């Protein structure tokens, strides 16, 4: 495991300062787009993980973004893999990681 690659990802600089809604069809910077075009590759690679720094975003993440992006990944890959592959923080809004985990846990615990 010492050869694992940890990707440092600054959300506001590398993706958007304005996280959007749930689906691509609803506008730019959606949870669906971030999940499928940024995170999916990392989750499918056995030796990659990501640290997402959400410091500097202008508008906060909507519940629909958090659910579609992070919640659906946790549901698909399982909470243990999710927690191993992804770390999330924000220096200017420390409660944001807790908010994200609420939607992750909710998605994992919902019966299909």
Give the residues covered by each predicted segment.
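Short beta-strand/loop segment at the start of cytosolic alpha/beta domains
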Residues: 1-15
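Short, Lys/Arg-rich amphipathic alpha-helical interaction segments
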Residues: 98-112
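Amphipathic alpha-helical interaction surfaces in cytosolic regulatory modules
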Residues: 11-50, 54-102
């Amino acid at each position: 495991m010492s050869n694992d690659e940890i990707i440092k990802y600054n959300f506001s600089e590398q993706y958007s300062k304005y996280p959007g809604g749930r689906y691509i069809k609803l506008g730019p910077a959606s949870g669906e787009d971030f999940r499928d075009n940024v995170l999916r590759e990392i989750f499918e690679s056995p030796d990659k993980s990501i640290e997402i720094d959400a410091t500097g975003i202008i508008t906060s993440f909507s519940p629909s973004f958090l659910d579609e992006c992070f919640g659906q990944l946790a549901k698909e890959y399982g909470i243990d893999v999710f927690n191993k592959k992804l770390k999330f923080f924000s220096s200017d809004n420390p409660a944001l990681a807790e908010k994200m985990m609420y939607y992750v846990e909710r998605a994992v615990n919902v019966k299909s």
